[in-house]
């Protein structure tokens, strides 16, 4: 929810509808940063929404933060983290800002000179990780943190953590019905995406059609690679025998190319390779996305340069 448009009455209404989890968009509490991104959202406004959620019985509250925003630096973001810790959300997502003005018109108002450089962004990220993990949050991986008592942390310790388009989850193999512009549904081995444009989305609904304009059905290789990638992202460890038995392959033969790509990670002690398993080391957890990407065949075959999920 957006605290700027969600008052206490709306929070109560959402809970009465049966919702029990809430994610708050914050980005940054610094006034200068908020002005630079045209999102004025005072701390007290977010605090009021969180208090209303607690009072109405929401079981879990997540807070989304973004680093790499204009006017942001280590000092300003440290204060934002202080305020986040004061509010004590159950989960925190710390995303990297992707500056893509050619794709997103509102970003064209942002001056490149106002953006922190790569070194500053990396320092902001590491500062935040240190502060959060020192204050009772577990680094789940892939930008996400949760309190040690949260079910995400418990699931990761037990090896039952899952991941979907919305992030990490404790619900294994659940289908996901997505509503809204550009959202993606997952049903079994099938994926379906809604239109990007609001006009196209509502036109389909008015005409009584499904608001879906494209889809994809996974093949056997896709399903195997999805399992490998998700296991690495969720557990930081992959047992070769589990893959062999589940998909009827010999891991070292099927993934010989990918294992070769692990050599630089092993050299820098980010990954540990054993005869029976692959393990992402403690200091390699921050790079788990990069490790998992090597098992994505489509990404390897693609010539496009990515820009959405880089670390810095």
Where do the protein language model's features map onto the residues?
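Generic non-transmembrane alpha-helical segments
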Residues: 56, 131, 261-264, 268
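Short amphipathic alpha-helical interaction segments
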Residues: 250-266
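C-terminal scaffold of the Radical SAM
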Residues: 1-252, 306, 310-312
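A short, conserved structural fragment
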Residues: 266-276
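Short, amphipathic alpha-helical interaction segments positioned at domain boundaries
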Residues: 283-312
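A generic structural signal for well-ordered alpha-helical surface patches
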Residues: 230, 241, 260-263, 289
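Minor-groove-contacting beta-hairpin "wing" of winged helix-turn-helix DNA-binding domains
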Residues: 277-281
């Amino acid at each position: 929810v957006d605290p700027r448009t969600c008052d206490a009455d709306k929070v109560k209404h959402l809970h009465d509808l049966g919702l029990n989890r809430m994610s708050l968009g914050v980005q940054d509490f610094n006034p200068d940063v908020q002005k630079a991104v045209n999102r004025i959202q005072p701390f007290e406004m977010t605090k009021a929404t969180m208090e209303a959620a607690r009072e109405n019985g929401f079981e879990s509250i997540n807070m989304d933060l973004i680093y790499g925003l204009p006017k942001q630096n280590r000092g300003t973001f440290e204060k934002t983290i202080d305020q986040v810790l004061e509010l004590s959300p159950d989960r925190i997502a710390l995303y990297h800002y992707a500056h893509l003005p050619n794709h997103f018109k509102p970003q064209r108002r942002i001056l490149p000179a106002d953006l922190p450089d790569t070194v500053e962004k990396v320092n902001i990220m590491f500062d935040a990780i240190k502060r959060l993990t020192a204050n009772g949050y577990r680094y789940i991986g892939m930008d996400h943190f949760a309190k040690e008592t949260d079910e995400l942390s418990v699931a990761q310790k037990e090896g039952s953590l899952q991941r979907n388009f919305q992030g990490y989850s404790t619900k294994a193999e659940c289908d996901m019905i997505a509503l809204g512009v550009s959202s993606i549904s997952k049903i079994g081995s099938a994926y379906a995406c809604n239109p990007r444009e609001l006009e196209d989305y509502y036109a389909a609904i008015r005409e009584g059609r499904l608001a879906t304009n494209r889809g994809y059905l996974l093949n056997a290789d896709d399903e195997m690679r999805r399992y490998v990638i998700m296991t690495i992202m969720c557990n930081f460890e992959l047992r070769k025998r589990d893959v062999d038995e589940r998909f009827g392959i010999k891991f070292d033969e099927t993934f010989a190319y990918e294992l070769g790509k692990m050599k630089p990670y092993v050299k820098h002690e980010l990954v540990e390779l054993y005869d029976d398993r692959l393990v992402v080391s403690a200091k390699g957890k921050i790079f788990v996305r990069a490790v998992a990407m090597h098992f994505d065949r489509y990404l390897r075959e693609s010539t496009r340069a990515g820009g959405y999920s880089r670390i810095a």
